[in-house]
């Protein structure tokens, strides 16, 4: 399970929005400045980059085939997976979703489209969701993201970046007795070998339980699959998933 953090960032460039006909072109647009800062968190192929943070780790478990990911994530036709166009070779999906930090823009505020006016925006803000691999220091990486945003916000714009919350990731040792027995049971029940994969979601309670009971072995069952679109407007779970895992 990945760890993560919520990061808030605000950019201000003007005392007030000013007429785009009179000042546009020379007056610094706060929305553009924030876009530039956020864009600097990705390389030219879309992979996450953060100043001072290693974003090149390799996943050692089961691979995540690109076509399976494309279907699971419901990419539109022609849309590229991040890192796919690197001339040196496509970056494995598993590296990016299970072994490296990832940053998603989960909210962005400037002038709403429905209220658009011919004025240069004076302020813009965003919320970023950071995910980090299990074992990484989520708080430290979140601080590095804030430092990165401050360093890469252009045109002398005033920027405020802060970590709103952070939580650690979690990983279990599949070689321990209970986990190994669970793997054997799953192999017997489903008639196929058990593979080691990442999950991506964050459940901070697991880390707290492990800290409180360091010798305990923790296993979780998830009943959702990609089509459940967890956290979206159309989130759902197929009841047969619950029936099958219980069986």
Language model regions located:
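Fold-level recognition of mixed alpha/beta catalytic cores in primary-metabolism enzymes, strongest
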Residues: 1-85, 94-101, 212, 234-243
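Hydrophobic core residues within well-ordered beta-strands of beta-rich domains
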Residues: 5, 124-126
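Zn-dependent metallopeptidase/amidohydrolase metal-coordination segment
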Residues: 10, 34, 108, 120-124, ...
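Short, glycine-/Ser/Thr-/acidic-enriched flexible segments
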Residues: 14-16, 110-112, 131-135, 166, ...
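A structural supersecondary motif
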Residues: 87, 91-119, 129
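A short beta-alpha structural unit
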Residues: 130-133, 159-175
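Short amphipathic alpha-helices in soluble, non-transmembrane regions
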Residues: 141-150
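Short, low-order "capping/linker" segments at domain edges
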Residues: 169-188
